[in-house]
Curated annotation (Swiss-Prot):
Major site of localization recorded for this protein: membrane
EC numbers: 7.1.1.-
Assembly and binders: NDH-1 can be composed of about 15 different subunits; different subcomplexes with different compositions have been identified which probably have different functions.
Catalytic reaction annotation: a plastoquinone + NADH + (n+1) H(+)(in) = a plastoquinol + NAD(+) + n H(+)(out); a plastoquinone + NADPH + (n+1) H(+)(in) = a plastoquinol + NADP(+) + n H(+)(out)
One Pfam entry name: Complex1_30kDa
GO cellular component terms, semicolon-separated: plasma membrane-derived thylakoid membrane
Top-level taxon of origin: Bacteria
Subcellular location as annotated: Cellular thylakoid membrane
Keyword set includes Translocase: yes
Designated name of the protein: NAD(P)H-quinone oxidoreductase subunit J
Gene Ontology MF terms in the entry: NADH dehydrogenase (ubiquinone) activity; quinone binding
The species this protein was found in: Synechococcus sp. (strain ATCC 27144 / PCC 6301 / SAUG 1402/1) (Anacystis nidulans)
Entries under InterPro entries matching the protein: NADH_DH_suC, NADH_quin_OxRdtase_su_C/D-like, NADH_UbQ_OxRdtase_30kDa_su, NADH_UbQ_OxRdtase_CS
Amino acid sequence: MPEELTPTPETAVVEAGPVSRWLSENGFENTALERDHLGVEIVQVDREVLLPIAAALFAYGFNYLQCQGGYDLGPGQDLVSFYHLTKVSDDASQPQEVRVKVFLPRHDPKVPPVFWIWKGADWQERETFDMYGIQFEGHPNLKRILMPEDWVGWPLRKDYISPDFYELQDAY
């Protein structure tokens, strides 16, 4: 008798949530990922379709960018840019939320900015650039926001090696 294959977290099929289904029904390619511990739907998209999908989600009612950030999956692995969106309205007792993730190759971490859709992304994208080196191509003011301008490297990458010494210059 053949052995049954037990699905692992890597092979388990994730049921598409309402946002993923809506995107698919409207011709936007996406992949449903497992919901987070709070039950927030997570959708993976390619960087080439991030802007059209972001604009569609804004038109669909996701009018608030709660958070934009990044993280590193580990040395030699992808970097991730994520966008936590919320539908804010006067009559919502429980606002709908979705998290959009874009997985970027470490050697080419480029993605378009969503600043043009949600103005609050401005400094959040700059922080993600500053800490992880994710390039938001077309951002109007993409420069370091936390680290000194002459800092070398991306401090929150898991393969970052801290310098032994860095001398801060007086501002005056």
